[in-house]
């Protein structure tokens, strides 16, 4: 199956507040709203996505969940016993997670949500994928700083589940999870829909 056959995700993002769940769209939107992680996780479930609570960084960029995660896992490590295998789309369970861990970052289970993400490390790779017929989609500016973006696509039902990590070029992932807005990166920056 060619890249051109991939469909856009069915969750347009408001260009004013950058939220996939904005009901005011465009000029009627009051602007960026900081929803709680719990409220946002529940909004993702309404989109048909499965979520998982993740560790969060404290004000110093250290592990905020109290489990002593090291720097590369702060803000990214799952808080449940079985990690991404515990992801859920059940409102009561998700509400309980964020009642227990109100500051938890949000992870989106790509496989169960039927998504795949492309994370290029340079703008040239976007041109490469566009030349292959990959259409525009919703985008997350990750907390990793300038030039770090996640391009979300709906995975066709017959597409394989995979993870390609070409760390100096790009990552393509339809397995595992991605950290999602409004999560906080260890740097203190917030993941944002753009």
Placement of each model-derived feature along the sequence:
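Conserved phosphate/metal-binding and DNA-contacting active-site motifs used
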Residues: 2-194
């Amino acid at each position: 199956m060619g890249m051109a056959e991939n469909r856009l995700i069915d969750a347009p993002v408001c260009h004013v507040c950058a939220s996939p769940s904005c009901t005011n769209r465009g000029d009627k939107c009051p602007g960026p709203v900081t929803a709680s992680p719990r409220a946002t996780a529940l909004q993702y479930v309404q989109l048909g996505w499965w979520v998982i609570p993740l560790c969060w960084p404290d004000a110093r960029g250290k592990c905020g969940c109290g489990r002593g995660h090291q720097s590369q896992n702060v803000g990214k490590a799952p808080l449940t016993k079985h990690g991404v295998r515990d992801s859920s789309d059940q409102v009561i369970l998700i509400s309980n997670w964020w009642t227990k861990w109100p500051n938890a970052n949000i992870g989106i289970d790509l496989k169960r949500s039927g998504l795949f993400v492309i994370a290029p490390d340079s703008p040239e790779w976007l041109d490469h994928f566009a030349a292959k017929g990959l259409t525009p989609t919703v985008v997350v500016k990750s907390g990793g700083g300038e030039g770090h973006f996640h391009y979300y696509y709906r995975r066709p039902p017959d597409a394989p589940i995979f993870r390609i990590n070409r760390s100096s070029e790009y990552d393509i992932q339809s397995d595992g999870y991605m950290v999602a807005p409004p999560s906080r990166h260890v740097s203190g920056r917030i993941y944002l829909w753009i």
